[in-house]
Amino acid sequence: RQMCIRDRLAYSAKTRGQLRKKLQSEGFETELIEPLLDKFEAAKLIDDAEYAQTFVAQKSRTKKLSRTALRRELAERGVRGEEAENALAQRTDEQEREDAAELVRKKLRPGMDLSDRAEKDKVTRRLLGMLARRGYSSSVSMSVIREELAAYGAEDELW
C-alpha cells in the first residue's frame, strides 16, 4: 500500500490533510495514518509549507486570486495557520490591486458604449461579481473598477 501512496505523491504534490482524507476514504485504520504521514513528512515526500508557497505563486499568476480566496483554498486542502500565512505574505496589496485591474481590463472590450448609464451599471455589476468570485474585497473592487472605467472612457475619447 505504501508504494501505491508514493506513486500518488510522485504524480502530484499533496498536503498532509489531503493524504489523510484519501487514506481514510481508502479504509486505512486511523491509528496507522498519522505515523505513516509522519514518515512521509520526515522523508520530505510531503511538505505543506512548500506546497503552500507553490500553490500561492501558481494560482496568483494563473487565476489572479486574492489572498482571501487563496487562504480559503489552502484551508480546503488542509493548509492552515502559519504555513498558509507565510505563503500568503508573498502577495502584496499592490500586486493584488494590479491583478484586479488586469482582470477588469480583460473584460472591458473595445467598442463598449459606457456612456449609457444603464449599460455602465450593468458592466460595473458584472465586474464586481467577477472580482468577488475571486475573493477581492468590495472596497478594492470598486476602487479598481472606477479607475479602469475612467481610463477606458479616456481611451475612447482619444479615438
For each predicted feature, which ranges?
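An alpha-helical, amphipathic repeat domain used for nucleic-acid recognition
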Residues: 1-159
